[in-house]
From Swiss-Prot:
Higher taxonomy: Eukaryota, Metazoa, Spiralia, Lophotrochozoa, Mollusca
Record-annotated disulphide pairs: C46-C52, C47-C57
Signal peptide: 1-16
GO CC terms in record: extracellular region; host cell postsynaptic membrane
Organism: Conus bullatus
Compartments where found: Secreted
Protein name: Conotoxin Bu1.2
Length: 59
């Protein structure tokens, strides 16, 4: 029974690592081009500081 448990844990770990490689990279830093496009899509009066975007831009 313990062997089955270890196999399940190993299989889950392998699947987790393989799907992480195929992720869209959402945990990576945005490129300068992405930041510029994001700034262009903001309504007037929005601040570029991520700390105040939610407050002033609703997003």
């Amino acid at each position: 029974m313990f062997t089955v448990f270890l196999l399940v844990v190993l299989a889950t770990t392998v699947v987790s690592f393989s799907t992480d490689d195929e992720s869209d990279g959402s945990n990576e830093e945005p490129s300068a081009d992405q930041a510029a496009r994001s700034a262009m899509n903001r309504p007037p009066g929005c601040c570029n500081n991520p700390a105040c975007v939610k407050h002033r831009c609703g997003g």
